[in-house]
Amino acid sequence: MYDVIVVGAGHAGCEAILAAARMGATCLLITSDLTAIARMSCNPAIGGMAKGQITREIDALGGEMAKAIDATGIQFRLLNRSKGPAMHSPRAQADRTLYSLYMRTIIEREPNIDLLQDTVIAIETKGECFAGVRITSSRVIEGKSAILTCGTFLNGLIHVGMNHFAGGRTIAEPPVVGLTENLCAHGFQAGRLKTGTPPRIDSRSIDYRKVDEQPGDIEPILFSFESKGALQSKQVSCFITKTTEETHAILRKGFERSPLFTGKVQGIGPRYCPSVEDKIFRFPDKNSHHIFLEPEGIDTNEMYVNGFSTSLPEDIQLEGLHSIPGLEQVKMIRPGYAIEYDYFYPHQIQATLETRLIENLYFAGQINGTSGYEEAAAQGLMAGINAVLKMRKHEPLILTRSDAYIGVLIDDLITKETNEPYRMFTSSAEHRLLLRHDNADIRLHEFGYRVGLLPEHRYQATRQKIEQINAVKTLLSQIRLESGLANKLLQELEYGEVTGAQQVTTLLKRPRVTLAKLLATSPELHSQLSNISNNPLVYEQVEIDCKYEGYLKRDALVAEKIQRLEAHHIPALLDYHAIAGLSNEGREKLKKHRPENIGQASRILGVSPSDISILMVHLGR
């Protein structure tokens, strides 16, 4: 009998199986195609707004995604450099073939992981507890717990124009039939969602004179806090072009053969990643939309047309591409398509990602209604950790909204109504100044170390970094820069003169004044700091902490107040009908979502502040 069975080997499944195995559990990974482990079926990239922060959080907890992209990335960029540090988000293009191979190699090296190429068609239970999985041969494999990471495979249906095919992720991959029905028979409620992907084109047929080059950063920021040294491969460029009014006219021609507009697609698509035809329909006043041409790897001519996700007929897709500058003679390797799939409403899971109906059964990834590799990987990691912690009768790992973007993601899933694919944004996190990509290791290393995923050397390295940050901050608060040196720097930055010696931390709070400029101005200051640390990452944290000190303190106080609400637990079987005074909508939503604490209850749509007050009085708070 296995300790943990993971069903599906996408990004959620990979993190789940690795976390459980590295924590010492005996694990089985079941997937319908072992050559497609961690396949990037859509965009060949990791990171981006909020997603880059999640990837670094996965790394800080001891997950693998950050190392995988560092090893197989072909272009690295830090987005939103012109904005504040809360908005900085790392992103990297991946060699999609190498990424999949990397993750398979890592999984095969783990001695606690067995692999099985098969399809799970049902789960088996004993009472209300998970007991095993049934595969296509009807054989039952017993396990103490299971994590379902089925992606878009559940009754997957692919649409290209008015044609549709059964498919799990691509036309070449069969869907999983029967598992949704089996879970519904156990009492779960399922819904239907849609996502899509753009056509792929031959890079040799692009006219590069008509597109704008977008190179990677000269000094790339890697994702893993453990990654050191040079990139594994030479960086490649992406390219930017845009649709035209002619493009829009061509695509409108195909609306009558669009599964989106003719009602053939019943699933709800992602609001913030719409198809190109949906953008044209929803924003008729816009004359053009940006198109990003992204290479799929070093040794392939295949290019991903980001911004042109579509399920229009093939002939319309190609004609539309030919109307875009630089793509007049482009050759289409494979068309874009939409895929519909089943998911399960996430109010049916707990904060640990264990299902409410069946004990020791966990859901992670798109089965919970999310979109994106990073969101899936984060859920897989947390499900893997919590499955093992529960098996050992240890306290679960539940990250709060002020701990991590991962905490925001899971909290949103279980408290908000999800009827469209959920994706993470920086705006989703009310504590985003605390949850930066650069401090993920500082925020989360204790959690990763406690559960046994973060190795000793990384834990100690982070502890040392924190000690150096504190020592540098203490030193800077005690040092004053004499007025001559201070004015020399301020004049260069077009500030007015100051009189008397200036405290270094006061100078550092000014816009455009950086620690690097202060050190260049004062060799003595540089020497004093060098005695503590020469680590630029330490200096970066010191500068951010100093510049945003007031905001950070205020945010921390707000987070502390919210934490007090999180400490007020609600009994799992509380009878909401017995609580007089609750609004009808509030009672209905509380009964549906079954919040675990007052904080969660307060974030449920439809539960009013007066409902929360009544609930707290009833619980004697």
UniProtKB/Swiss-Prot annotation:
Gene Ontology biological process terms, A to Z: tRNA methylation; tRNA wobble uridine modification
Protein localization: Cytoplasm
Cellular component terms (Gene Ontology): cytosol
Swiss-Prot/TrEMBL keywords: Cytoplasm, FAD, Flavoprotein, NAD, tRNA processing
Source superkingdom: Bacteria
One MF term in the entry's GO annotations: flavin adenine dinucleotide binding
Binding site for FAD: 8-13
Cofactor or coenzyme needed: FAD
Main subcellular location of this protein, as a coarse class: cytoplasm
Residues that hold NAD(+) according to the record: 269-283
Keyword Secreted among UniProt keywords: no
Function comment: NAD-binding protein involved in the addition of a carboxymethylaminomethyl (cmnm) group at the wobble position (U34) of certain tRNAs, forming tRNA-cmnm(5)s(2)U34.
Subunit structure comment from the entry: Homodimer. Heterotetramer of two MnmE and two MnmG subunits.
The family this protein is said to belong to: Belongs to the MnmG family.
Name of this chain's protein: tRNA uridine 5-carboxymethylaminomethyl modification enzyme MnmG
Gene name for this UniProt entry: mnmG
